Design a protein with these regions (language model features):
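Intrinsic, low-complexity polybasic segments
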Residues: 6-7
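Bacterial N-terminal signal peptides
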Residues: 11-24
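PEST-like low-complexity, intrinsically disordered acidic/proline/serine-rich tracts
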Residues: 24-273
């Protein structure tokens, strides 16, 4: 698939350039601190196949440090069932093809903007899920960002202020943590290839903890202005023991517009690296 390759190569060339320029984004910098209270095998390793933990009231917990498989970040359709296709509205398919032809040069994340929902579920960086009464918070290492999911019984607002992460409310349905989100701005990208979404977008995520070390997220994308019907993808999260998220300051090392000057907005630094 040409669009996947070109978007991927653009990202990889950018990463390589940042490394050569002294960008300090390295897995070797991650902290090494034993995670207390988790099941372990006889050799001391985290037992990722142990039963899923539960809170005192018997509900599963999704708290912990996780990373996605990242198989959907370049191409969200990898999470669809075989034979399914994205049900584009004609204008949205045309916009997507334009972004493919431009090698996704207008990707908001290239300007250190957060990926939004559900794209941030796919990025190849860790994120920490924290559960507190009335609120689940997700701390993303990528772009040093966070997301709030309100679990105090409130409804989604009727006229929210448009935002990259939207507005999210959550509830438990059996063993699934169900998150509904709306209130997005009109420049959301669903993946690195540039599949679009807009202010009519509504995302439903169902988090199911399979065992101690794995969570499956079933994601429904419903945007009637952009797609002709709702459609679904699935991603898997992997538990990361004995470490933590680290600081990620995108703007300190952002040289994207010097590498790809024709994507730069007015006033951005371009030219020599």
């Amino acid at each position: 698939m040409k669009y996947v390759a070109s978007a991927f190569m653009r990202k990889m060339l950018l990463v390589a350039a940042l490394v050569l320029l002294g960008a300090e984004i390295s897995a070797g910098q991650w902290l090494k601190v034993p995670t207390p209270g988790i099941p372990r095998t006889p050799d001391g390793r985290a037992d990722l196949n142990a039963p899923a933990p539960r809170t005192a009231d018997g509900k599963p917990t999704i708290a912990g440090l996780w990373r996605p498989t990242a198989r959907l970040i370049e191409n969200i359709t990898r999470g669809m069932k075989p034979g399914e296709t994205v049900p584009f509205q004609p204008w949205a398919e045309a916009l997507f093809k334009t972004r493919v032809a431009n090698n996704a040069k207008d990707d908001p994340t290239s300007n250190c903007i957060v990926g939004g929902v559900p794209r941030s579920d796919f990025v190849p960086y860790p994120f920490k899920i924290i559960e507190t009464p009335g609120l689940v918070t997700i701390l993303y290492e990528a772009v040093h960002s966070f997301r709030q999911i309100f679990t105090d019984g409130r409804k989604l607002p009727q006229d929210p202020n448009p935002a990259w992460f939207g507005y999210s409310v959550g509830r438990w349905e059996g063993d699934a943590f169900v998150v509904e989100s709306s209130g997005f701005n009109d420049n959301v990208w669903l993946d690195n290839a540039g599949r679009p979404a807009g202010e009519a977008l509504r995302v439903t995520e169902r988090f199911r903890r399979i065992d101690f070390g794995h969570i499956d997220i079933d994601i429904t994308i419903d945007d009637p202005k952009t797609y002709t019907r709702p459609w679904n993808v699935t991603e898997r999260l992997l538990y990361i023991p004995d470490t933590d998220i680290i600081e990620y300051m995108c703007t300190e090392n952002n040289r994207y517009f010097r590498i790809v000057p024709d994507a730069a907005p007015p006033g951005a630094p371009v030219g020599k690296r």
